Design a protein with these regions (language model features):
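Amphipathic alpha-helical dimerization/coiled-coil segments
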Residues: 2-17, 34-38, 86-129
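Generic detector of contiguous secondary-structure segments
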Residues: 7-23, 61-69
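N-terminal helix-turn-helix DNA-binding core of bacterial DNA-binding proteins
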Residues: 15-57, 81-92
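Secondary-structure transition/capping residues
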Residues: 28, 43-44, 72, 112-115
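Canonical helix-turn-helix DNA-binding module
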Residues: 47-76
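Short, Lys/Arg-enriched C-terminal cap helix and immediately downstream tail that follows
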Residues: 72-74, 80-81, 98
Length: 129
């Protein structure tokens, strides 16, 4: 089993990944990311273009894009008064989340299998009633 240091490191990584976890934890933001990927415009997409592809209002799309940007998933560039959103090319925050999740899988996979205890707990509970 992994030691306390590894578990503490995992806890620190999850805290560091809080923004991206919150960003991808919303169904609307996941939908926006998928739509942007399907649009495939490397130079970026405007809020209005994305709004046309979703059921969300323009202010809602803008709000969700800002959260994705703050989480490091998207970047934005300005051309005059126009804002173009595009995927961050280094994807550092997404890679960090993947590493944290892999660390969690590694730790959890070393824990003892407790599935057989479920039946034992039910039998014990029935016996004391």
């Amino acid at each position: 089993m992994k030691g306390e240091n590894e578990i503490n490191k995992l806890a620190e990584e999850f805290v560091a990944c809080k923004d991206i976890l919150m960003a991808v934890g919303d169904e609307n933001r996941l939908h926006l990311m998928i739509e942007m990927m399907q649009m495939g415009n490397c130079s970026g997409v405007r809020v209005g273009d994305i709004t046309e592809k979703t059921h969300l209002s323009r202010p809602a799309v803008s709000h969700h894009l800002q959260i994705l940007k703050a989480a490091g998933i998207l970047n934005m560039r300005k051309e005059g008064t126009k804002n173009y959103y595009y995927f961050n090319s280094d994807l550092t925050s997404m890679k960090r989340l993947i590493r944290a999740l892999q660390m969690a899988v590694d730790i959890a996979s070393e824990l003892p299998d407790r599935s057989e205890m479920q039946g034992q707990n039910a039998e014990f509970a029935a016996a004391i009633e």
